[in-house]
Amino acid sequence: MAASCVLLHTGQKMPLIGLGTWKSEPGQVKAAIKYALTVGYRHIDCAAIYGNELEIGEALQETVGPGKAVPREELFVTSKLWNTKHHPEDVEPALRKTLADLQLEYLDLYLMHWPYAFERGDNPFPKNADGTIRYDATHYKDTWKALEALVAKGLVRALGLSNFSSRQIDDVLSVASVRPAVLQVECHPYLAQNELIAHCQARGLEVTAYSPLGSSDRAWRDPNEPVLLEEPVVQALAEKYNRSPAQILLRWQVQRKVICIPKSVTPSRILQNIQVFDFTFSPEEMKQLDALNKNLRFIVPMLTVDGKRVPRDAGHPLYPFNDPY
């Protein structure tokens, strides 16, 4: 079953369900990609920092292109610029490394992964002696200008942002000659992001939800935190529609035209996650799921300082999550 699409302002069609690859182990991700492509996925979400683009490239090389199972023009591939590569001189080399690893001539979408820059170099998490991150003063508006040059060169079809606040999006729009097409953020019924989605849609950006199932596999999970997949309303709808709780959460998103990139390396789940286009919730059922919102953000980069877990970047002037949305 192919996923339905949204139309980006660039004219590109972006499938509403893609395969996420964050936390997909090398050794597993190649088979996951190949399986996903055989069951109808046409959207793969990648990032340099995930450390698995080389293996994803092997899967794409075997499956995508002239005379192979999937024509390149049918596939939508996203990747992301890491924080150590924000300096304008580093942007194109970073993209070219991603393209080489993925064995692609162009990306359909390239996102700035976070608004703030880390110190330049090959260490992805440069640190001070006390364990805090070493930042770089490059502003995302300057990085954006360097990203725009990649579109002019035909290396990237569309640009976007990840983990930016509404204010930061407007800041980019104020200098952009190539407008961002997509914002990727954490989003699920506990963090519905209604204001941010409305903000984006009013400005011609589509929204992609990462961790759409609540990321229960994250390393720092607090055992006392609520579990989205176990919510009674989710369970009740799963029973009513004879679906899994995951399918209920994904259907809620695609029904509000939010793109989802659930990660899995398990074939049965990969298949299940795309089977969300043959049932529809009533407006009342959508409201029941909307009511789960508690602005609960799970994905906040953390550090251990003096034995305590603290948000790694919260003191940075460009930290996005200090803004209301």
Curated annotation (Swiss-Prot):
State the organism of origin: Sus scrofa (Pig)
- Please name the PANTHER family in this protein's record: ALDO/KETO REDUCTASE
Q: Where is the active site?
A: Y50 (proton donor)
User: Its Gene Ontology biological processes?
Assistant: aldehyde catabolic process; cellular detoxification of aldehyde; D-glucuronate catabolic process; L-ascorbic acid biosynthetic process; lipid metabolic process
Its recorded name reads Aldo-keto reductase family 1 member A1
Q: Which residues carry this modification: N-acetylalanine?
A: A2
Chain positions found as Phosphoserine: S4, S211
The protein's role, per its UniProt record: Catalyzes the NADPH-dependent reduction of a wide variety of carbonyl-containing compounds to their corresponding alcohols. Displays enzymatic activity towards endogenous metabolites such as aromatic and aliphatic aldehydes, ketones, monosaccharides and bile acids, with a preference for negatively charged substrates, such as glucuronate and succinic semialdehyde. Plays an important role in ascorbic acid biosynthesis by catalyzing the reduction of D-glucuronic acid and D-glucurono-gamma-lactone. Functions as a detoxifiying enzyme by reducing a range of toxic aldehydes.
Q: Does the keyword Transferase apply?
A: no
**GO CC annotation:** apical plasma membrane; cytosol
- The record's top EC class is oxidoreductase
Report the residues modified as N6-succinyllysine: K127, K145
Q: Which reaction does it catalyse?
A: a primary alcohol + NADP(+) = an aldehyde + NADPH + H(+); glycerol + NADP(+) = D-glyceraldehyde + NADPH + H(+); glycerol + NADP(+) = L-glyceraldehyde + NADPH + H(+); L-gulonate + NADP(+) = aldehydo-D-glucuronate + NADPH + H(+)
Q: Which UniProt keywords apply?
A: Acetylation, Cell membrane, Cytoplasm, Lipid metabolism, Membrane, NADP, Oxidoreductase, Phosphoprotein
Molecular function (GO) terms for this protein are: aldose reductase (NADPH) activity; allyl-alcohol dehydrogenase activity; glucuronolactone reductase activity; glycerol dehydrogenase (NADP+) activity; L-glucuronate reductase activity; methylglyoxal reductase (NADPH) (acetol producing) activity; S-nitrosoglutathione reductase (NADPH) activity
Q: Where in the cell is it found?
A: Cytoplasm, Cytosol; Apical cell membrane
Q: Does Lipid metabolism count among this protein's keywords?
A: yes
Q: Positions of the site: Lowers pKa of active site Tyr?
A: K80
Similarity-based family? Belongs to the aldo/keto reductase family.
Per UniProt, where does NADP(+) bind?
A: 11-22, 45, 162-163, 211, 213, 215-216, 263-266, 269, 272-273
Q: Which residues are recorded as modified (N6-acetyllysine)? A: K127
Subunit (UniProt) = Monomer.
The EC number(s) this enzyme carries: 1.1.1.2, 1.1.1.372, 1.1.1.54, 1.1.1.19
Gene (name only): AKR1A1
